[in-house]
């Protein structure tokens, strides 16, 4: 079982990166699996469209240690989201190799999972960074928004350069 707010956060923070490309169908969902993070087990959701990657962790729910990794389809994520508004609700999650079930006291949502292998997303995440910076999320979002307005429609890229005491955004 997992609290509704935990599942809501996992899917809300990862769904923006779900691919809509039909040729790489295995990217058309959120990869939900148990992983190690700094010495403890976590429930991790990952999504990517090949350009953006979202990875979000939550404490591993009791009894989930043997859960197989599954790719939850985009449509299922959307339908499930409608069930997760009650903060006091516990969601019973059952997973097999081919299906996933989310059950509330009143509603059960069962879905096939995507039959495919999610790519090794850890290979694209830089390791051993010597420079790190913490920024206020809302200030950062506003700055990216301002710079993105002058980026080209084709690339929509915003470059980040970390200097000694500041972060410079450019197109």
Can you annotate each of these PLM segments?
Residues 1-171:
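Structural preference for solvent-exposed beta-strand-turn elements
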């Amino acid at each position: 079982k997992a609290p509704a707010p935990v599942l809501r956060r996992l899917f809300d923070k990862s769904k923006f990166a779900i691919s809509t490309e039909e040729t790489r169908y295995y990217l058309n969902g959120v990869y939900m699996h148990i992983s190690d993070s700094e010495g403890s087990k976590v429930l991790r959701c990952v999504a990517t469209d090949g350009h953006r990657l979202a990875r979000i962790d939550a404490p591993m729910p009791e009894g989930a240690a043997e859960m197989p990794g599954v790719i939850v389809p985009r449509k299922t994520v959307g339908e499930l989201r409608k069930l997760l508004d009650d903060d006091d609700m516990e969601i019973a999650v059952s997973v097999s190799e081919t299906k996933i079930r989310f059950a509330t006291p009143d509603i059960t949502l069962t879905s096939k999972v995507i039959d495919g292998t999610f790519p090794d997303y850890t290979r694209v995440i830089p390791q051993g960074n010597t420079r790190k910076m913490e920024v206020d999320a809302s200030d950062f979002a506003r700055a990216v928004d301002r710079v993105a307005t002058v980026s080209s429609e084709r690339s929509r890229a915003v470059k980040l350069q970390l200097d000694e005491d500041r972060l410079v955004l450019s197109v």
